[in-house]
């Protein structure tokens, strides 16, 4: 039985009329957010805007928090005067969604205990859809950085509320799902896999992002970059290293 599902490119109308009702019958609950452009559209047009969704088994988890991350808003708030950030990243309306779930005690087997000393085990599931165009490798990479940075903030706040003594980004399990629109040798995959990336990586296309990129590093705005933008998570891919024959079949 599938514990949770993460989907991208789900149309708003399809989420509310097809996916959510059908999955609720199978004991799932869900969270969905459309791309940012939906805010300025008519009700009829809004139905056809796609977004990201997360579904989870109600018998296994209780929803504690839910968050939508609009990349254009994060870009605007962290532009620091970068024209590239405003003209290339902020103009794309991709989004991500995150849920903080409490794991039901019944799921722990004999001898198993929550990671925290507190009697509550949380799990975070995050799902995002990055920009598609190969000519915008910089945008894909920065969107990924922004999302991971926002997830880190959500995780730290959830960790402090759950009674954890630290805000270690690895103190709560994280499942990160995404349509990265990126190949295995891309800066996006390098950043996620290696814990960081050089601030002069070729995927930035030599554009002037350096100052604002530090806003998304685990060192923070006042930290020392040492030429790298880092995220602090210990991520491991659920896929094999080999390139899949296809990721979309029509």
Write out the residue ranges for each language-model feature.
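Generic hydrophobic alpha-helical segments
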Residues: 1, 19, 99, 144-147, ...
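Short, high-confidence coil segments that cap the C-terminus of an alpha-helix
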Residues: 2-3, 171
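Acidic, proline/serine/threonine- and glycine-rich low-complexity intrinsically disordered segments
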Residues: 3-7, 208-211
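Metal-dependent phosphoesterases centered on the DNase I-like endonuclease/exonuclease/phosphatase
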Residues: 24-29, 135-250
């Amino acid at each position: 039985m599938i514990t949770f599902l993460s989907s991208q490119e789900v149309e708003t109308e399809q989420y509310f009329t097809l996916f959510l009702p059908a999955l609720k019958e199978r004991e799932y609950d869900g969270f969905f957010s459309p791309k940012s452009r939906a805010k300025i559209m008519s009700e009829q047009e809004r139905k056809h805007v796609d977004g990201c969704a997360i579904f989870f088994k109600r018998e296994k988890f209780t929803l504690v928090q839910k968050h939508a991350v609009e990349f254009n808003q994060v870009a605007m708030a962290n532009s620091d005067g970068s024209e590239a950030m405003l003209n290339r990243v902020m103009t794309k309306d991709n989004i991500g969604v995150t849920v903080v779930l409490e794991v039901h005690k019944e799921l722990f087997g004999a001898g198993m205990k929550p990671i925290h000393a507190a009697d509550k085990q949380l799990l975070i599931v995050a799902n995002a859809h990055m920009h598609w165009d190969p000519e915008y490798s910089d945008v894909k990479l920065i969107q990924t950085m922004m999302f991971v940075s926002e997830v880190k903030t959500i995780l730290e706040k959830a960790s402090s509320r759950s009674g954890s003594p630290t805000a270690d980004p690895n103190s709560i399990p994280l499942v990160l799902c995404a349509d990265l629109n990126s190949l295995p040798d891309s800066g996006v995959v390098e950043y996620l896999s290696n814990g960081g990336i050089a601030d002069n990586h070729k995927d930035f296309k030599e554009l002037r992002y350096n100052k604002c990129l530090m806003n998304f590093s685990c060192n923070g705005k006042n930290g020392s970059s040492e030429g790298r933008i880092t995220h602090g998570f210990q991520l491991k891919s659920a896929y094999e290293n080999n390139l899949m024959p296809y990721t979309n079949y029509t």
